[in-house]
Amino acid sequence: YRDTVCAFCALNRKTDSEIGKETVLFMSERPARPDMLFVFSDQHNAHYCGFDGHELVETPNLDRIASRGTVFESAYTACPLCVPGRSAMLTGQLPSHTEIYTNSGIIPSDQATFLHSLGSVGYETVLCGRMHFKGPDQRHGFTRRIMGDITVVGGGRFGEWRKELGVYGEHNLRVGMAGCVDIMGGGNSPVLEYDRAVMEAALEYLGQHHEKPQCIVVGTYGPHFPYVAPPELYRRYRDRVEVPVSWADEGDVHHPMTEEKKQRTRTDPETGDGVPVSEEDVRAARAAYFGMITHLDRQIGEVREAWDSYLERNDREGLFIYSSDHGDTCGEHGIFGKHTFFEGSAAIPLVFNGAGVPENKTVSSPASIIDIGLTLCDLTDAPPPPAQDGASLRPCFSDDDSQKNRHVLSEWMHSREDAFAPGRMIRRGRWKYVSFAHSDCSGLL
């Protein structure tokens, strides 16, 4: 916007014969902004990646992208729950400022996001797939939406599919937190079908020509439960996966708030009764989860190849980002899913690759999901949205000493006995402190 105004003022000061020269000069002096592709998954445990050192989970495409980019190995969500974490990422504000703590929260339409900032400097901001928006506004700064969501009907060609996808229709409750281990194994699922449609839409879009610089966000629902992987990938992990050492954690290891999150039973499909979750169930869930991650990695490889072709075809520079809204403990500490400040739930993968990003670099300083938007604005000279709680990660690319003492916050509103207990986590250096209000137990360090 500012560039446009400056150009307009300059043109008004020139004679007709000079206008063409001024326009050419202005356009040639303005640095080209990189196109951006941001793959944003749902519920990917940050430590279940090859590039993070996991010995079993295979993620060759992400590993290759990470080796040619910068990895933030201590990145965290602002809230270990979908809508609050995603709202924080888009707005750059903590849940205590967005006032969104549950999956029913709605971002006000007059709330600025980093997409608005990118749009103001000429970007076409495109949403392909999941963002878990609630309410009538399904854009929040996106100028185009080429694929709808699976849990909320939005714009795009496949937004209505959720009504026809079996387990996400009449059996929706069975794949929520309470029933996440009721369905697991190898096969097909609404998650796999939805993500396939998301990737098809992304590949189709990247096969087209676009005049404006692009910021494309590809949102997948995988590897969110139900824990169902393609059969071949489930078999690959089924006999190799182990039960986490922390599965049987008891006593002082748990804060009272996390003790209540332990998954002790599942529903017997034949009788409908609650039965104890066995170690075999844990292995099955983890084998499927690992298979879903590898499946997602394959899809990322496909879209990355199309992205590289798009950049080459249009002679443009590109920036690639991968992250997730939160993690999944998947049996660690006896818990499945999110809702806690354990590393498996609160930590997120965060990788930058491409224009302006160092290769083969790992940053150990803590980073937050609320830093992503500010970083993209910084890398593209876009104005930052107002009232930001985060900070650009760009200084971390150059080993700025001021970044060594970074700290990040994560917030969660725990529901307990018909009351809410707000909790906070702070990570600085190698320490993490967790505390809940209205708790009968002190914080954990």
Predicted stretch roles:
Residues 1-3, 12, 16:
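Intrinsic-disorder-associated, low-complexity terminal segments enriched in Asp/Asn/His/Tyr and depleted
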Residues 5-9, 20-443:
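Formylglycine-dependent sulfatase
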